[in-house]
Swiss-Prot record:
It comes from Paracoccidioides lutzii (strain ATCC MYA-826 / Pb01) (Paracoccidioides brasiliensis). Residues 1-4, 132-155 are lumenal. Belongs to the WRB/GET1 family. GO terms for cellular component: endoplasmic reticulum membrane; GET complex. This is Protein GET1. Required for the post-translational delivery of tail-anchored (TA) proteins to the endoplasmic reticulum. Acts as a membrane receptor for soluble GET3, which recognizes and selectively binds the transmembrane domain of TA proteins in the cytosol. GO terms for biological process: tail-anchored membrane protein insertion into ER membrane. InterPro entries: Get1, Get1_fungi, Helix_hairpin_bin_sf. Residues 44-97 form a coiled coil. It is found in: Endoplasmic reticulum membrane.
Length: 207
């Protein structure tokens, strides 16, 4: 089944990308995007930000006011600050609770769309061969391993194909990462050489 073969491959690529970037980084990015949309979360985020600015502003005014020379003004600012701080803490708790629910939902959807979907495919298509091997191409013992656990003999099961995809994607990802690091390292080395050569030329001109 070519479609199943490609689907499993792309799922493992998606899992590798998520693990490489970091699930927490992706969650933070999704939360940032979500709070920019016209939703209740964006309204709550704006209210929280405004309350925080108000608390900070009142705190600055309090610090700039003498509690001895301008006690009445200072006391009024103190009451306003305490009230604003209390309202901010209530709003911040609501916002944090909403964000926690969002993180749980994102984690559940991410697992269901990647690892959970792979497990479902492996269970549902456990008897379906990914592709068929040529007859008498390899020993029957190897054929049995490749068809494990429930695919017909002489075929490759979805479990074996999934494991091969995971290994292949990891190796390719490591190779790409090593290449990028090498290229950036070479670029930094060339810049260091150029800087060193420029310093030598300047020193020669001074002499």
């Amino acid at each position: 089944m070519p479609s199943l073969l490609i689907s499993v491959l792309f799922l493992h690529i998606a899992i590798y990308i998520i693990n490489t970037i970091g699930a927490s980084t992706i969650d933070s990015l999704l939360w940032l995007i979500y709070t920019k949309l016209p939703t209740s979360a964006s309204c709550m985020a704006r209210e929280q930000h405004q309350m925080k600015l108000e608390v900070v502003q009142l705190k600055r005014e309090m610090n700039a006011t003498s509690s001895q020379d301008e006690f009445a003004k200072w006391a009024k600012l103190r009451r306003r600050h305490d009230k604003a701080l209390e309202e901010y803490e209530v709003k911040n708790k609501q916002f944090s609770r909403f964000k926690s629910l969002f993180d749980v939902a994102v984690k559940a959807l991410r697992w269901a769309g990647t690892s959970g979907l792979i497990l479902l495919l492996q269970f549902w298509f456990s008897k379906t061969p990914i592709f068929t091997l040529p007859p008498s191409w390899i020993p029957w013992q190897v054929e049995w391993v490749l068809s494990f656990p429930r695919a017909p003999m002489g075929t490759v099961s979805i479990q074996v194909w999934g494991g091969a995809c995971a290994v292949m994607v990891a190796l390719v990802g490591e190779a790409i990462g090593a290449t990028v690091r090498y290229l950036y390292g070479s670029k930094d080395s060339m810049e260091a050489i150029k800087v060193g050569a420029g310093a030598v030329e300047k020193e020669k001109k001074r002499q």
